[in-house]
């Protein structure tokens, strides 16, 4: 019998363990929870930088998540780096089946190498498909600025508060902006 809360984490596999599912599982354990994981991508990285990311096939992501969710009742779902637009879509479909499970979205936007147009497409998909289902969105000011570029042009009148208000209007219950603004 499982007595500690189960938390399902979607994220990349980081060989250093600084981000991704390895870090999530360690954090969950430190707080008395048991972590379940679905790998969305594989990193090539060291302690100084992330060199590359290889997305896991979205069918694998979906199948692994469904197997876990059909077997165990989770107390929360945490989503980290996603790896591809297809993974965003697959995960959005899965979590839509669990609207009463709190969803924490911490997409590690600034931790991964930029992927050109794919990067913009991933951010747009996150905004359109995941943020409306999110209980708590966690972003740094730099990540918030990058995400905001998917819905607005750079404007000196735009503020962090305006961007947060926009995300809440999309349906996100809470937005936590960590650290200090870049300005």
Where are these regions (language model features)?
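Short, glycine-rich nucleotide/cofactor-binding loops
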Residues: 11-18
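Conserved N-terminal subdomain of the carbohydrate kinase-like
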Residues: 2-9, 23-112
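Conserved phosphate/ATP/ADP-binding segment of small-molecule kinases
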Residues: 120-183
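Short, well-ordered, mixed-charge alpha-helical segments that flank or form enzyme active sites
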Residues: 86, 111-116, 145-147, 183
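Glycine- and other small-residue-rich loops at beta-strand/loop junctions that grip anionic moieties
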Residues: 13, 79-80, 115, 178
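Conserved phosphate-binding/catalytic loop of the ribokinase/pfkB sugar-kinase fold
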Residues: 57-60, 111-131
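Short glycine-enriched, charge-decorated loop/helix-capping segments at active-site entrances
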Residues: 49-55, 115-120, 150-154
């Amino acid at each position: 019998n499982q007595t500690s809360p189960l938390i399902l984490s979607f994220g990349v596999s980081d060989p250093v363990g600084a981000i991704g599912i390895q870090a999530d599982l360690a954090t969950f354990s430190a707080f008395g929870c048991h972590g379940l994981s679905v790998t969305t991508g594989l990193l090539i990285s060291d302690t100084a930088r992330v060199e590359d990311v290889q997305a896991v096939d979205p069918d694998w992501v979906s199948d692994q998540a469904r197997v876990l969710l059909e077997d165990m009742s989770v107390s929360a779902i945490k989503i980290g780096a996603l790896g591809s637009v297809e993974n965003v879509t697959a995960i959005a479909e899965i979590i839509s089946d669990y609207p009463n499970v709190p969803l924490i979205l911490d997409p590690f936007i600034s931790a991964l190498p930029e992927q050109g147009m794919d990067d913009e497409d991933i951010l747009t998909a996150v905004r359109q498909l995941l943020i409306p289902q999110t209980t708590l969105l966690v972003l740094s000011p730099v990540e918030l600025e990058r995400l905001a570029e998917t819905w607005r042009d750079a404007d000196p009148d735009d503020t962090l508060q305006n961007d947060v208000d926009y995300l809440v209007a999309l349906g996100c219950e809470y937005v936590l902006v960590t650290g200090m603004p870049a300005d």
